[in-house]
Amino acid sequence: MSAENINELKKWVAELARQGSGEDFVGLNRVVDIVSKNFGVQPHEVAIMTITPDDRFLRFLFPSMLREVGQIPLTSTNALAARTVREKRPEVINHFAVVPHSSVFEAVPIAEDTRADAIQKIMSAPIAVDRKICGVIQVSRKGKSAGEAGPDFTHQQLRELKAIGDALAPCLALSPVAK
């Protein structure tokens, strides 16, 4: 991620934290725009989740259409996001379509009449404050095939995503959902 984009991201996150709510979705939308442009994906291919107050589930903050669909149990053995929390480490999977995983969230339409393609490639990184995981950020590439989805994610991009997660942490820690 360019220094300019990182600085812009930090500015938006600082503003969200000042406002005292990680659920300022206008601000969060701007963060997602910056992240999606950096990785060359569509905004709906960026997911930001926060851990619920009882430390049992992950709840989507973005994409907005997944907020009310459901939550991911942290005990789930098939959810990459839950594994990211449990193992406290980022991960990249460039063959995600063939990895057993829960696809319930992939079935949610991205627009009223538009179904999303399957996730082919994905990066997942924990969001932590003082070493306590408070959420997960994921960036995916969707398509009918891995080739159609675009280039593989690199380990450098995974490091960038981890840095983005670190930058988002102050805002997510203040989210009413995370308290």
Q: Which residues does each predicted region cover?
A:
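Juxtadomain coupling helices with adjacent low-complexity linkers
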Residues: 135-179
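A short, aliphatic-rich beta-strand micro-motif
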Residues: 120-129
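Regulatory sensory and allosteric helical modules in signal-transduction proteins
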Residues: 59-61, 66-106, 113-115
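Amphipathic alpha-helical regulatory segments at dimerization interfaces
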Residues: 15-19, 29-41, 49, 83, ...
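Signal-transmission linkers at sensory-effector interfaces
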Residues: 1-26, 174-179
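GAF sensory/regulatory domain recognition
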Residues: 33-36, 46-72
